[in-house]
Amino acid sequence: MGTRFLLALCLVLLVLGFEVQGTQLPKQDEPPSPALLSQVQESLSSYWESAKAAAQKLYEKTYLPAVDEKLRDLYSKSTAAMSTYTGIFTDQVLSVLKGEE
């Protein structure tokens, strides 16, 4: 497996993990509408809910505090690095746009 695949997999699992741990808000009943857009939205919502439920079961089954801590540490380090590199990139773009004076 490539590094990109593992990174993408970790990010997807991290997002699903945060979604699973998030607060559960009560759903409000909406009147049914025959519009195609609402049907697609309901279908996608049901797929997301089933994926979230599967992730919740997997999370509860395989929860390891050490791995969770490592993932959180990895996330914080990677976001810190990205903000640093974004700042460097922004400075470079601004210096190119500004030009030599």
Curated annotation (Swiss-Prot):
Signal peptide interval: 1-17
Database matches in InterPro entries: Apo-CII (IPR008019), ApoC-II_dom_sf (IPR023121)
A GO term, aspect molecular function: lipoprotein lipase activator activity
Assigned keywords, A-Z: Chylomicron, Glycoprotein, HDL, LDL, Lipid degradation, Lipid metabolism, Lipid transport, Secreted, Sialic acid, Signal, Transport, VLDL
Post-translational modification comment from the UniProt entry: Proapolipoprotein C-II is synthesized as a sialic acid containing glycoprotein which is subsequently desialylated prior to its proteolytic processing. Proapolipoprotein C-II, the major form found in plasma undergoes proteolytic cleavage of its N-terminal hexapeptide to generate apolipoprotein C-II, which occurs as the minor form in plasma.
Transmembrane stretches, start-end: none
Entries under Gene3D superfamilies matching the protein: Apolipoprotein C-II
Location(s) in or outside the cell: Secreted
Region named Lipoprotein lipase cofactor: 78-101
Region (Lipid binding): 66-74
One Pfam family in the UniProt entry: Apo-CII
Gene Ontology biological process: cholesterol efflux; chylomicron remnant clearance; chylomicron remodeling; high-density lipoprotein particle clearance; lipid catabolic process; negative regulation of cholesterol transport; negative regulation of lipid metabolic process; negative regulation of receptor-mediated endocytosis
GO cellular component, one term: spherical high-density lipoprotein particle
Family: Belongs to the apolipoprotein C2 family.
Role of this protein: Component of chylomicrons, very low-density lipoproteins (VLDL), low-density lipoproteins (LDL), and high-density lipoproteins (HDL) in plasma. Plays an important role in lipoprotein metabolism as an activator of lipoprotein lipase. Both proapolipoprotein C-II and apolipoprotein C-II can activate lipoprotein lipase.
Stated name of the protein: Apolipoprotein C-II
